[in-house]
């Protein structure tokens, strides 16, 4: 058996069950483990509880239980500059950002990784559901987690080969119920703690309130694509393409009771377009343009790829043809896709391997740009 005691792994511990079990498994495998709690947002939750304080208490309890040293590090400035400012800028531009993708790229696998290296880390580890496979030549491939419902490679798609070289994902071969069971068997303080949801590090805040604290809302007209006025919208930033709820209109407008959906935006005129039917024509597209396209291992500057893609988290893969040129790509769908949303990530897969991805700039319907921003 290999001696892991000389290999130092610094674990990002959030106070949740996944990162707790990550630290436990590495400790049991004999690694030299250090736990790090990242404080990236200074705030309280909707009930006035400072969630960071509560989470840190859980990290301390778990670290003490499994017998590892732990530290707290403050990345509030880095988070604000590299993630939250981007988040706000995207909403200002009428897009729907994915802060978790940027948070992984810039905080968990950049600021945190850099800090871990100052502690003499050989690797960092997190509680993400993903796997890494290493070739004989040292190339690292990122693979989906075996728990299909929990696989998080979509959010890790912007990681570089250099970041992956230094990363371990101990939960990648486990399913969530097994992780809970391991936590309970070890008597970990976080064994029964519910999973966190919401925006990366900010948590379960009222989203509308959070946005309105930083961006002034600009109410405007809500219209059908053929020009019927449907009332007022609260501000384009509060709506995403394909959204059903929160429109304040029912089937009473028009002859049928089919539900209404957001089918487009016009930022320049501050108009929100709505239409009836889940598969409304305006929601369907045949291709997209992406920028900030990045691959997890070395690829040519210009090439064409036949693969599958996801356009949102937990969506089944769809067959696509990808024409890559530098950090931009045209992605052509084998079948029309619904509600392709500017600002979201498009992520490419070859079987089990996550190849990388980019950020969606525009969707197209038979060569015509869809009015989504």
Swiss-Prot record:
Pfam families: tRNA_Me_trans, tRNA_Me_trans_C, tRNA_Me_trans_M. It catalyses: S-sulfanyl-L-cysteinyl-[protein] + uridine(34) in tRNA + AH2 + ATP = 2-thiouridine(34) in tRNA + L-cysteinyl-[protein] + A + AMP + diphosphate + H(+). GO terms for biological process: tRNA wobble position uridine thiolation. One of its GO terms (cellular component) is cytoplasm. Disulfide bonds join 103-200. Residues 150-152, 312-313 are annotated as: Interaction with tRNA. Residues 98-100 are annotated as: Interaction with target base in tRNA. It comes from the Bacteria. GO terms for molecular function: ATP binding; tRNA binding; tRNA-uridine 2-sulfurtransferase activity. The active site is at 103 (nucleophile), 200 (cysteine persulfide intermediate). Keywords: ATP-binding, Cytoplasm, Disulfide bond, Nucleotide-binding, RNA-binding, Transferase, tRNA processing, tRNA-binding. InterPro entries: MnmA-like, MnmA-like_C, MnmA-like_central, MnmA-like_central_sf, Rossmann-like_a/b/a_fold. It is an enzyme of class 2 (transferase). Its EC number is 2.8.1.13. It is found in: Cytoplasm. Catalyzes the 2-thiolation of uridine at the wobble position (U34) of tRNA, leading to the formation of s(2)U34. PANTHER family: MITOCHONDRIAL TRNA-SPECIFIC 2-THIOURIDYLASE 1, TRNA 5-METHYLAMINOMETHYL-2-THIOURIDYLATE -METHYLTRANSFERASE. Belongs to the MnmA/TRMU family. This is tRNA-specific 2-thiouridylase MnmA.
